[in-house]
From Swiss-Prot:
GO MF: methyltransferase activity
Other known facts: Encoded by the cryptic lambdoid prophage DLP12.
Residues of the signal peptide: none
Highest taxon, organism lineage: Bacteria
Organism listed in the record: Escherichia coli (strain K12)
InterPro entries: Methyltransf_12, MeTrfase_VrtF, SAM-dependent_MTases_sf
Protein name, UniProt field: Putative uncharacterized protein YbcY
Amino acid sequence: MGVSNRLAWGCPTKEHLLPHFLEHLGNNHLDIGVGTGFYLTHVPESSLISLMDLNEASLNAASTRAGESKIKHKISHDVFEPYPAALHGQFDSISMSYLLHCLPGNISTKSCVIRNAAQALTDDGTLYGATILGDGVVHNSFGQKLMRIYNQKGIFSNTKDSEEGLTHILSEHFENVKTKVQGTVVMFSASGKK
């Protein structure tokens, strides 16, 4: 992750992505698309963390890496589907770090993912994360190669994803939307759910 973030995407983890993650972290947090659990190793011990991923192995690996004592719930769920009612209005913060560019479809088809997450936030909660853009940014040769390979293999689905498109789908569900592009990555936060 560190090598590709720095060299391919131009958005070093420790300088940009980790501070963004920690800045928006609430006391009762849901991490969606948990990956390796890297960010969770940096959360304060007092935080209540829940994990959501469709992949049980990822849930277990992230939970182990973060420390089981920090994990409140492990939720196996498809983010394109509405969340169980028990999750509605539960979380102060929800993160989607490098989730959106891995989901199938164009950016507009991912609007339901934002809507579903918004329902799980408290009224003053924040949805935030980062995603790799395919449109409106200039990829270096390493980034171009990875984009081509990952999109061909179906690991990514982001060739047309743009900051403008992301802002649009976030604004459909939130009053306050902020984005910042670093390299070919857009970091975002959204609050004031509609």
